[in-house]
Amino acid sequence: MSNETNANSTDSRQGVTNIGSVPAYLVLADGRTFKGFGFGAIGTTLGEAVFTTAMTGYQETMTDPSYHRQIVVATAPQIGNTGWNEEDNESHDGSIWVAGLVIRDLAVRVSNWRATTTLQEEMAKQGVVGIGGIDTRALVRHIRNEGAVPAGIFSGADAERPIEELVEIVKSQPSMVGANLAVEVSVDKPYVIEAEGEARHTVVAYDLGIKQNTPRRFAARGVRTVIVPAETPFEEIKQYNPSGVFISNGPGDPAAADIMVNIVREVLAADIPFFGICFGNQILGRAFGMETYKLKFGHRGINVPVKNHITGKIDITAQNHGFALKGEAGQEFETDFGTAVVTHTCLNDGVVEGVALKSGRAYSVQYHPEAAAGPNDASPLFDQFVALMDEDSENQKEEA
């Protein structure tokens, strides 16, 4: 169906538009515009335009809280083929966190036995604005060359306003630089994911935008996980007598997360085993005294090669980050907690992908070993954390 038609029609399902019937524009802050058709919710959404190279896993991507305030461009040519199910949500309550979705082609037929609804229906239900019919190859090249850029999707009546006016609306949105967004996606109160079988350890996990596959990974290893809100004071988590502390992935600028940095410094000073993922890697790095910076267009995909400079091993990883730590492969430096080292870097561009204390008491990676979606190459990082807690437990028994 042509996306040039002006008719705004809906089918028998409330709020679901017929593909191509609603005009829409993707507008970038630099003045570049793309005409397409609206789907999902109809209206306006603003966010930073970023792209993901993942060919699968759009549901996991869209429900990942790390994508808060970002309009995600899918490089896969067709999205929606597997519909939407109740099992693959990565947010705690099934919420979609992307600000908007940009695609080339919207699948009209769902082909997955687990699907309970379509992508378009779920987006309409949750009020998420999408635009299709876009030359995503040209758009991704533009973002790659010019960098992630503020953007807006305008569909329906909103798309009829003058382009100059839409550009000004896009320009007026707040920057990702300096944005402390983890508190906006975190839970309000603690909750527990029990271990499968007898619990060997209890881990306190700070929810800065945690994906649900993380506590699942812990549970499968006999670890009880207490998920606490971002910025929960260190003194409060002592009540759980944690064997280890975990900091999750999350959105925003790590340079604005001073409270979390100070909490991690308290954890390190108490010599409690520490593991961090993604945003947690940046927080640990800052606790070590490292600086962060914003990447030009970030790393987002499920096929990113990372080298472990301690073992020499290369993993294919899932990634989603727009900020990174400043450092070099194998770099060693002194911290208030002992000697630290840059353990991992990305083979594509040399970006820091992991740091650790040489003592082994604290470590983190920039990528997502929990996957969802993505490869499982890095899942042994969870085993490493459990082994560290096992060692502590054995030492405590010997001392007793």
Curated annotation (Swiss-Prot):
Alphabetically ordered keywords of this record: Amino-acid biosynthesis, Arginine biosynthesis, ATP-binding, Glutamine amidotransferase, Ligase, Nucleotide-binding, Pyrimidine biosynthesis
Keyword Membrane annotated: no
Pathway where it operates: Amino-acid biosynthesis; L-arginine biosynthesis; carbamoyl phosphate from bicarbonate: step 1/1; Pyrimidine metabolism; UMP biosynthesis via de novo pathway; (S)-dihydroorotate from bicarbonate: step 1/3
Enzyme Commission number, as recorded: 6.3.5.5
Catalytic activity of the protein: hydrogencarbonate + L-glutamine + 2 ATP + H2O = carbamoyl phosphate + L-glutamate + 2 ADP + phosphate + 2 H(+)
Region (CPSase) residue spans: 1-199
UniProt domain Glutamine amidotransferase type-1: residue ranges: 200-395
Primary enzyme class: ligase
Binding positions for L-glutamine per the UniProt entry: 66, 250, 252, 279, 282, 320, 322-323
Top-level taxon: Bacteria
PROSITE patterns associated with the record: GATASE_TYPE_1 (PS51273)
A single GO BP: L-arginine biosynthetic process
Active site: 278 (nucleophile), 368, 370
Pfam families on file: CPSase_sm_chain, GATase
Residue stretches spanning the membrane: none
Protein transport is among the record's keywords: no
GO terms assigned for molecular function: ATP binding; carbamoyl-phosphate synthase (glutamine-hydrolyzing) activity; glutaminase activity
NCBIfam families noted in UniProt: CPSaseIIsmall, PRK12838.1
Record's function text: Small subunit of the glutamine-dependent carbamoyl phosphate synthetase (CPSase). CPSase catalyzes the formation of carbamoyl phosphate from the ammonia moiety of glutamine, carbonate, and phosphate donated by ATP, constituting the first step of 2 biosynthetic pathways, one leading to arginine and/or urea and the other to pyrimidine nucleotides. The small subunit (glutamine amidotransferase) binds and cleaves glutamine to supply the large subunit with the substrate ammonia.
Family statement: Belongs to the CarA family.
Oligomer status and interactors: Composed of two chains; the small (or glutamine) chain promotes the hydrolysis of glutamine to ammonia, which is used by the large (or ammonia) chain to synthesize carbamoyl phosphate. Tetramer of heterodimers (alpha,beta)4.
Listed name of the protein: Carbamoyl phosphate synthase small chain
Protein species of origin: Corynebacterium efficiens (strain DSM 44549 / YS-314 / AJ 12310 / JCM 11189 / NBRC 100395)
Gene name for this UniProt entry: carA
